[in-house]
């Protein structure tokens, strides 16, 4: 399995190699979680879910989940299974978990792998993947199950697209700093050939849970709320954040306030 990861790196364009390696490892972690029956309790969410399930054209760093069925949930059990599977596949692995309330997280680190893949001159360089599980997610999400072939055959429970969009809008409205990844993902949602609208119930519950002080969001007002937020963001610096993760680096030039506002307003017609 490790040799397959290194082969993928060798076959990739130089600028994509670190992302390709990370994505293979993400797939391996998802496969281990699936084998441990994690998706009976967890739903896959966030940017990596968008990439794996809906072919988002940007790479992502973290694996994010929502705990939908808490009965019998034990975070450490999933980590133990994942660590064992990765080590059996030939990877050196260290786990660094944190079970703070309400977010359970763990950094899975792969010491020496970047050097072995000729992506770093330093033997001690570490590639890491962060797993994060929201153990008290807001209510109202729609759930779906999808089977995909992403290096491994994966059967994933996940939030549906309107609920994933609600999660993205919540991040955009509540982060203390702007992430270019949020802007890119918003533009992706707004420019889809098949229109998608956010799960407003989930968005409202998420905003209430994080004590958001803005006006109540509705199916009619969410675009205006997002438009106000976009005027607060420095789109140039935000675009710098997402550049290294884009499949097509030239898309970075599209991440302007003008373009995002145009897509946002177009949906009102």
Region annotations inferred by a language model:
Residues 66:
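Glycine-rich active-site/cofactor-binding loop and its immediate structural neighborhood
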Residues 1-43, 53, 69-269:
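Structured mid-to-C-terminal alpha-helical surface segments
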Residues 45-48:
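Glycine-rich beta-strand-to-loop/alpha-helix junction loops that act as flexible
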């Amino acid at each position: 399995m490790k040799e397959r990861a290194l082969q993928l790196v060798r076959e990739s364009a130089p600028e994509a190699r670190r992302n390709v390696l990370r994505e293979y490892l993400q797939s391996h972690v998802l496969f281990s979680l699936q084998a441990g029956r994690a998706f009976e309790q967890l739903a896959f969410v966030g940017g990596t879910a968008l990439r794996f399930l809906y072919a988002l054209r940007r790479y992502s760093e973290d694996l994010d989940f929502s705990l939908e069925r808490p009965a019998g949930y034990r975070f450490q059990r999933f980590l133990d299974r994942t660590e064992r599977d990765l080590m059996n596949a030939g990877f050196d692995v260290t786990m660094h978990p944190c079970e703070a309330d309400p977010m359970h997280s763990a950094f899975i680190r792969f010491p020496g792998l970047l050097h072995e893949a000729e992506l770093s001159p330093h033997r001690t360089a570490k590639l890491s993947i962060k797993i994060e599980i929201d153990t008290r997610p807001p209510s109202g999400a729609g759930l779906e199950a999808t089977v995909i072939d992403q290096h491994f055959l994966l059967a994933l429970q996940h939030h549906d697209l309107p609920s994933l969009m609600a999660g993205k809008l919540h991040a955009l409205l509540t982060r203390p700093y702007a992430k270019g990844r949020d802007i890119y993902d918003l533009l992706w949602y707004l420019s889809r050939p098949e229109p998608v609208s956010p799960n407003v119930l989930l968005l409202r519950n998420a905003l209430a849970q994080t004590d958001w002080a803005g006006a109540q969001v509705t199916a009619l007002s969410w675009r205006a709320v997002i438009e106000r937020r976009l005027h607060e963001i420095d789109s140039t610096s935000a675009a710098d954040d997402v550049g290294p993760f884009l499949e097509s680096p030239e898309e970075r030039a599209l991440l302007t306030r003008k373009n995002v506002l145009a897509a946002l307003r177009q949906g009102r017609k």
